[in-house]
């Protein structure tokens, strides 16, 4: 396997990421409904995990498409579980966590396409999910922040789906690395 950062293989990095995230994760509250669905994609069906907090209204709730971090090569639904349900609980929003394809096995634009298809799917299924289609936002950290920003820009450029808000947390969006 090719060496990644820190001279370790990608498999070793993924194993460490999983180990640490599993040890840090906490289970969601018993009152939160959590289930998984599949988003049909272009050559790949995207697994998503949906979190509905007890405080969310039955219809017209805000929705958040959450895209995990991990340098585009690590992370999954389990490693980002606490972050995703935390967003749901704190915002009283229905959160849809996206299990996009990882590099290097799936080079660009695979992850972007998975996230874009997930946003479109949430918009198309908003009524069934109990989400107000005018209140769908994006959230992501690190690589997920990058993907959230890219998905938001595409939605803007082609006229939708409309994005109500974006929580883009320490995104990898600038190559200059010259920050104040």
Task: Please provide the spans of the model-predicted regions.
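Short beta-strand element of the alpha/beta-hydrolase
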Residues: 59-70
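Short amphipathic alpha-helix adjacent to the substrate-entry channel of hydrolases
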Residues: 78-98, 113
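Active-site loop/oxyanion-hole signature of alpha/beta-hydrolase fold enzymes
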Residues: 107-120
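Hydrophobic/aromatic beta-strand patches that form the interior of the parallel beta-sheet core
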Residues: 65, 96, 167-169
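A glycine/proline-hinged amphipathic helix-loop "lid/cap" segment
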Residues: 1-53
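Primarily recognizes the serine-hydrolase "nucleophile elbow" in alpha/beta-hydrolase
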Residues: 117-180
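Short beta-to-alpha linker loops that shape the active-site pocket of alpha/beta-hydrolase fold enzymes
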Residues: 54, 99-103, 172
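Conserved catalytic-core motifs of eukaryotic protein kinase domains, centered on the activation segment
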Residues: 76-78, 106-108, 179
């Amino acid at each position: 396997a090719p060496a990644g950062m820190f001279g370790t293989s990608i498999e070793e990095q993924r194993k460490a990421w999983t180990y640490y995230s599993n040890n840090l994760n906490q289970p969601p509250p018993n009152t939160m409904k959590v289930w998984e669905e599949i988003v049909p994609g272009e050559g790949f069906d995207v697994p998503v995990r949906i979190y509905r907090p007890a405080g969310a209204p039955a219809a017209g709730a805000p929705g958040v498409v959450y895209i995990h971090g991990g340098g585009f090569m690590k992370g999954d639904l389990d490693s980002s579980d606490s972050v995703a349900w935390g967003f749901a609980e704190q915002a009283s929003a229905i959160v849809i966590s996206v299990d996009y394809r990882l590099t290097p096995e799936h080079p660009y634009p695979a992850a972007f396409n998975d996230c874009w298809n997930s946003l479109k799917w949430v918009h198309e299924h908003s009524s069934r999910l109990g989400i107000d289609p005018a209140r769908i936002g994006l959230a992501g950290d690190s690589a997920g922040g990058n993907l959230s920003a890219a998905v938001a820009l595409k939605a803007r450029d082609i006229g939708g789906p409309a994005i109500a808000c974006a929580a883009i947390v320490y995104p990898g969006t600038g190559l200059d690395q010259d920050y104040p």
